Each structure stands twice: as C-alpha cells, then as structure tokens.
Amino acid sequence: MMSAASTNPEFPIATSGTKDIVLAFSGGLDTSFCIPYLQERGYAVHTVFADTGGVDAEEREFIEKRAAELGAASHVTVDGGPAIWEGFVKPFVWAGEGYQGQYPLLVSDRYLIVDAALKRAEELGTRIIAHGCTGMGNDQVRFDLAVKALGDYQIVAPIREIQKEHTQTRAYEQKYLEARGFGVRAKQQAYTINENLLGLTMSGGEIDRWEAPGEGARGWCAPRSAWPSEALTVTLKFVEGEAVELDGKPLPGAKILAKLNTLFAQYGVGRGVYTGDTVIGLKGRIVFEAPGLISLLTAHRALEDAVLTKQQNRFKPDVARKWVELVYEGFYHDPLKSDIEAFLKSSQAKVNGEVTLETRGGRVDAVAVRSPHLLNTKGATYAQSADWGVEEAEGFIKLFGMSSTLYAQVNR
C-alpha cells in the first residue's frame, strides 16, 4: 500500500482535516477499492452513480448499499438514459461507423459520468474528482480530458497510483478489501465489466491472454444453444435520422434502445471479440455485446442507403470516422466534434421512413425499407428495365470511362 506521505502531485494527500472528494462509482472492484483507499488518506468520499442504462432496480440498490457499506459520506444516483441518447446515440447512429470499422464505442457514457460527477462536486463545493480508471486503458484519457475541458479540477486516480507499485492490481485490490472485511463478487474477480444502455464490454482473464473467451465471459447475448427457434421481426420508424417508434409505438429513444437490447440479445445479435489500438498505443482486447445498438445501426444504414445520394453516401463515412476517433480518444468536447455533428445532422433531413429488421440468430438484416424519399426512378428497375435507350447507355459508358480508355490507347 502506498505511504500516506506520498508527494505525487497527481494524488494529493489530505494531511490535515477532511476534504470532500467526488468519486465516479459503479460498485465494481476498482471503484469499491477507491472508497476505503481514499478514506485512509483523509478524504470524505461522496459517490455518484450515473445510471446510463446498464443496470436494473436490483443492481441500483446493490450499488447504493455497496457505497454505504464501504463508508461513503454520501451517495447519489443520476438517471443518464436521456443524456446518453441525446449526447451519444443520435450522433453515433448518424455517423454509422465503429472505431476501426468494428467497435461501437460502448463506454462513451464516460463523458456523461463526468458531467454527473462535476455537478455533484459543485453541489458540495469541492474541486476534487476521483475515478477508478487504470493507467493502461483509454478511460483515464476520456475522464481526464473531459474534466479538464469543463473546469479547473484536481483529479485523483487511485488505481493508476497503485499500479506504480503493484503489477497484479486486481488481486491487490481484492486482498485490500478483504483485509478490511469487504467481500468481492465472484465475477468481479475475473473480469472488468462495463454495462450501460449502449451495451456491455468485458476484459481480463483469458480475454487478456488472447485465448478464446469462456462461457463466463458472457453477459446479455444468449449462446447459440438458447436462441429461439422462431425468427424475430421488428419495425423501426425514423424521423430525420432518429428512431421514434418501435413496431408502431412511439417511444423515447432510450426506451427504444433498451427494448432492442432485450429483444435481440435473445438471438445473440451484436456480440464480438475486438482487438484494437488504444489511445496510448497498446493493443486492447475485449468481448463486447451491443444487440440493440447494432440493430439500430443496421436499420439506419439501410434507410440512408436508400435515401441519400451517391455522393453523400461516399463522403459521409470519411467525416464519420473522424467523429468516432474524436470520441474514442477523449476529445468529446473538442469543437471539431461539434462541427462534424452539424454536418451529420444536416445529412439526416431526408432520412425518414420505416425499416423492418429480421434475425434468426447471430446477425440481423434489414429486410424492408419504406420512405417517401426513396431515390428510385419510376421507369427503371435495377438490371431489368429503364426509361432510357440503349444508345444513351452506350454514350454514358463511353464518356464515363474516357480517361481509362485514352490511357490504354496511348500506352499499348
């Protein structure tokens, strides 16, 4: 354990009296460790749990009781569902791109957690914020950059601090808590788990060892043996690129996504093993599950394909990839992100209509699209009939390929 006399400016020690500190708390191993660790260094720890849609009522109650059990001076739970829909899901779906073409940015609720923590700090009159991020991952970058962008705060990162002296930090945290009479849930011992409205990620254990994930590394998505035998079909309605109805029923966006999570998780949709480049240059490997978000992206992309022009569909992914990179790398409050979102919002003006999704397990397909803005021609059907003549088609082909034809003629 680190000495209370540490002078590391990143981890200030309250040596006289008690200072209020706000801890972004999830009830997991890392943030559970943070409470007694900070208390023993002279802090009154006020915990904030931002409920961004990954827990049920029973789990919320557990988190509240866990904070009290560990000795938190106060605890508040903040409803982050509407904020995560407006602040992340809408622009992410408009962008339609995963990080490095795969990962759907499932821990982007970190920025909303920061907002909740800073609001609580303002209520308490303190400028000291703590989080349970490690010194090797991306979350520390997202938390710290978001806090720095929003004001002059002191950031305390206990897990990052103990990693200077302990290589097996999770084992150390567990022993630390058990030595003080606090139990640790079994799954917390093996994996780092993040859950929210967007989906679920797991790391640790065999995942970090580049081995096949065991059955314990499974959260929402049912295994193949448990998939229903009947196909699932749902219809989503979009207005200006935003999902507003599910199967004909108007619902708030966050509730639509929550229902899609439940429906498509039964069929194992949206589960993957992802290896990518982290912000700090390491390779990161996780299991992720995002049944609702993947289904929503599939429907939205099908509608865009049908109503946007060829040039829009060609150009938008380039801009979208930059937006995804900014969010992934911690630049959530950079003005370029807002600039890109203005373009993405503009591109959605005609993205209106209904899309029917279908799954029989493992993947989801958009099987029907209806929109008043479909870019089809009454007199033309792809590869079958058209309202232009053969001569017009031949002339178009000649002009369209003129540059390549001339090059070939000159260089034969």
From Swiss-Prot:
UniProt-listed Pfam families: Arginosuc_syn_C (PF20979), Arginosuc_synth (PF00764)
GO molecular function terms noted in the UniProt entry: argininosuccinate synthase activity; ATP binding
Reaction(s) catalysed (UniProt annotation): L-citrulline + L-aspartate + ATP = 2-(N(omega)-L-arginino)succinate + AMP + diphosphate + H(+)
Chain positions recorded as L-aspartate binding sites: T134, N138, D139
EC number(s) per entry: 6.3.4.5
Enzyme class: ligase
Record NCBIfam families: argG, PRK04527.1
Protein name: Argininosuccinate synthase
Lineage of source species: Bacteria, Pseudomonadati, Pseudomonadota, Gammaproteobacteria, Lysobacterales
